[in-house]
């Protein structure tokens, strides 16, 4: 399965504008719920979070200049959630094997005095446990790192290396235990399978950019 790095399109040079992102500062009890989501809790009985609004670092009059199927977050929101998505995109994602664990939270987005149904996409939860660390290939100073078996061991080693040397571990091959259409990586990339990328483009989903990656990703 081929993967692409995917990013939210945020900067528009031709229009000289930046994308507005979702701020949940007006959601009742939002901080309480968002903190629980931040800690990877799945809240099955969460209320509809009403409402978010778009905001950017540009002038206020440009906050709502563009609406996409995917936005990021700003201000008050559940930390570590990175996609705020339209109902159309949610329906598409549900047709795929998204991630080992994930959840959608229904919200309302106030946009140009009208409310739209948007969703907080809580993902991936525990995605790094889907890695085979013994078969994956990652290096420091061109020397392959061996002996790591779990996500916790890798995280501890990564922190130690950064603290002592300020160097990043270089990944050359990710081996996944199971196949999913969205993969998070230790280097910060969010990967999208070729078939999901194709479906996004064919269904006119607006807001993503896709890039080739310079490392290998395989599933056992």
Residues of each region from the PLM?
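Phosphate/anion-contacting hairpin/loop surfaces
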Residues: 1-220
């Amino acid at each position: 399965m081929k993967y692409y790095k995917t990013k939210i399109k945020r900067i528009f040079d031709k229009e000289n504008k930046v994308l507005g992102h979702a701020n949940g500062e007006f959601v009742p009890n939002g901080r309480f719920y968002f903190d629980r989501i931040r800690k990877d809790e799945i809240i099955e009985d969460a209320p509809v979070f009403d409402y978010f609004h778009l905001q950017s670092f540009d002038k206020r009059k440009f906050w709502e200049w563009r609406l996409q199927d995917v936005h990021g977050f700003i201000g008050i929101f559940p930390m570590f959630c990175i996609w705020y998505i339209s109902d159309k995109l949610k329906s598409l994602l549900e047709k795929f094997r998204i991630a080992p664990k994930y959840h959608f939270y229904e919200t309302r987005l106030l946009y140009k005095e009208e409310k739209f149904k948007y969703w907080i996409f809580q993902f991936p939860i525990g995605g790094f446990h889907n890695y085979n660390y013994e078969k994956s290939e990652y290096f420091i100073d061109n020397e392959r790192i061996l002996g790591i078996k779990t996500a916790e061991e890798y995280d501890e080693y990564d922190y130690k290396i950064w603290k002592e040397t300020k160097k990043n571990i270089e990944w050359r091959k990710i081996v996944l235990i199971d196949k999913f259409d969205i993969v998070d990586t230790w280097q910060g990339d969010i990967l999208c399978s070729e078939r999901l990328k194709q479906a996004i483009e064919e269904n006119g989903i607006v807001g993503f950019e896709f890039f080739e990656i310079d490392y290998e990703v395989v599933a056992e």
